[in-house]
């Protein structure tokens, strides 16, 4: 494996949201739109994605502060793991690894824990893939979110996915699951917000949830020992900013974690292929990138969000591929599972 060591204090460009909007050719008046004027503009200015009139509930609580765009440590950037690999025109690991039960949509609720939730989900998928579906475990986002502080970030306020991957190497992470999941060490502690079809209603959410405390023990009533329940990684890295390198990484090892700038128009995404079109910068978000495809001659990435399975395309969304839209291809975090720890 080849690596490039980039001695950078900040890996991503430090432009303001307005500068980035201008760089993408978005008119100044379109950058300032919100509400109904924004919805009307999106519907007449593009045809790649359908627009929701109503914005995503608890939107501000689901994304991170823009400061988490900037990496604080030196990064190991991995070259294309297999430059000679044949890349298929489309790829969805759910069709390949049908026995992997880890491919489902999470719900981070009113907590900016996307960095931990997406990393835990990607690790879970990679464990299943590395073991050829023999090992099925949902890695605990809670363990990462609450115990990897301050090096990973600040829990529900946000964090850095690459640091979560490093934590997986050096500290290990226990089993987890969604809210109230039984027979796991540390399930997600924050209930889903509001109504979600026929799912259990736990109540509404107000503001950003406080970060729960770090508890280095399994929940009461679970016959697991915290230290023994841990799984470990053996490598963590940023994937080279190249469509083929990202595709090769996903083909070889499984889903990765992508981070991107979130603008006002993403608040109104319903379905289709998202491309930033209008609205101001609102924050930053981390998601699990699982595959890619093409629709009507438009290349896209296939991405699992963590805003419940009634958001977007059954919890997923697609974003235009090959243009680094919103920085989606700029900081792809990944890691290798230590199969001996499974």
Swiss-Prot record:
Pfam family, one: Peptidase_C1
Species for this entry: Haemonchus contortus (Barber pole worm)
Propeptide: 19-86
Disulfide bonds: 100-128, 111-156, 147-214, 148-152, 185-218, 193-205
Top EC group: hydrolase
SMART domains: Pept_C1
Signal sequence, start to end: 1-18
E.C. number: 3.4.22.-
Protein name (Swiss-Prot/TrEMBL): Cathepsin B-like cysteine proteinase 1
Role, per record: Expression of the protease correlates with blood-feeding and suggests a role for the protease in blood digestion.
Alphabetized GO MF terms: cysteine-type peptidase activity
Protein's gene: AC-1
Keyword ATP-binding: no
């Amino acid at each position: 494996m080849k690596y490039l060591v980039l001695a950078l204090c900040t890996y991503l460009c430090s432009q303001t949201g307005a500068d980035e909007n201008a760089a993408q050719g978005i008119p100044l008046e379109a950058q300032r739109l919100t509400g109904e004027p924004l919805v009307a503009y999106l519907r007449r200015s593009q045809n790649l994605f359908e627009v929701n009139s109503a914005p995503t509930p608890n939107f501000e609580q689901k994304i991170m502060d823009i400061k988490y765009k900037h990496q604080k440590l030196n990064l190991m950037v991995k070259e294309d793991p297999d430059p000679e690999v044949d890349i298929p025109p489309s790829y969805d690991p759910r069709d390949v690894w049908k026995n992997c039960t880890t491919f489902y949509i999470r719900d981070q609720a009113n907590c900016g824990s996307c960095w931990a939730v997406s990393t835990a989900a990607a690790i879970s998928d990679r464990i299943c893939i590395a073991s050829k579906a023999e090992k099925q475990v949902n890695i605990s986002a809670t363990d990462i979110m609450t115990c990897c502080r301050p090096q990973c970030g600040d829990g529900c306020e946000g964090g850095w996915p690459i640091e979560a991957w490093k934590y997986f190497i050096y500290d290990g992470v226990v089993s987890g699951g969604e809210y109230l999941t039984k027979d796991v060490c540390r399930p997600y502690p924050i209930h889903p917000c509001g109504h979600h079809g026929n799912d259990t209603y736990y109540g509404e959410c107000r503001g950003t949830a406080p970060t729960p405390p770090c508890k280095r023990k399994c929940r009461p009533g679970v016959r697991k020992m915290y230290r023994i329940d841990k799984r470990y990684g053996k490598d963590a890295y940023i994937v080279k900013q190249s469509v083929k390198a990202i595709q090769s990484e996903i083909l070889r090892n499984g889903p990765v974690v992508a981070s991107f700038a979130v603008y006002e128009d993403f608040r109104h995404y319903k379905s289709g292929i998202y491309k930033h079109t209008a609205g101001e910068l609102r924050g930053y978000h981390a998601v699990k990138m699982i595959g890619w495809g093409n629709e009507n001659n438009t290349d896209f990435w296939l991405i699992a969000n963590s805003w419940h399975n009634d958001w977007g395309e059954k919890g997923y969304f697609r974003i235009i591929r090959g243009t680094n839209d919103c920085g989606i291809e700029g900081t792809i975090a990944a890691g290798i599972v230590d199969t001996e720890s499974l």
